Amino acid sequence: MGRIRNFDRDAVLESAVDVFWERGYDGAGMQEICRVTGLNPGSVYAAFGDKHGLFIEALKSYMTSMSRETIARLNSNPSGRAGIADYYAALIVAMLGGKRRWGCLVTNSIVEFAMNDPQISEAFQLHLARLETALSGAIER
């Protein structure tokens, strides 16, 4: 019988996002990941398979959250133009005043992986398609 997981998966993924965002995939070592998430290496491997598995789950979690926020912001106003303006205003505020000031995680990751990883490429394509659909809808309004 395996041990029961005793950690908040969402909190671990959010912490992992911060490490990967700040350092990039290659720059994020397991020691740093374990320190920030509070997990030991065995727990990371048991829960996510390996660093790559953790990265994919963290990236998907981030992109899902970001897509929801973006779509909600774009749809928050009956005027598509106002929704787009609200989205970009919030983006500027987040970039200038937020704790995460390392560029765009998705763009950084696309550059780092250069679309050579099929799992990550699929996640990027799904995320970008969601955003494109939301932005197109706002433009059409």
Where does each model-flagged region fall?
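N-terminal intrinsically disordered/low-complexity leader segments
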Residues: 1-7
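Helix-turn-helix
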Residues: 11, 15-53, 57
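Hydrophobic alpha-helical connector segments
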Residues: 57, 71-101
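Short, basic, alpha-helical segments at the C-terminal edge of helix-turn-helix-like DNA-binding modules
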Residues: 60-66
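Amphipathic alpha-helical packing segments from all-alpha helical-bundle domains
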Residues: 82-86, 118-141
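Amphipathic alpha-helical segments used for helix-helix packing
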Residues: 83-84, 98-122
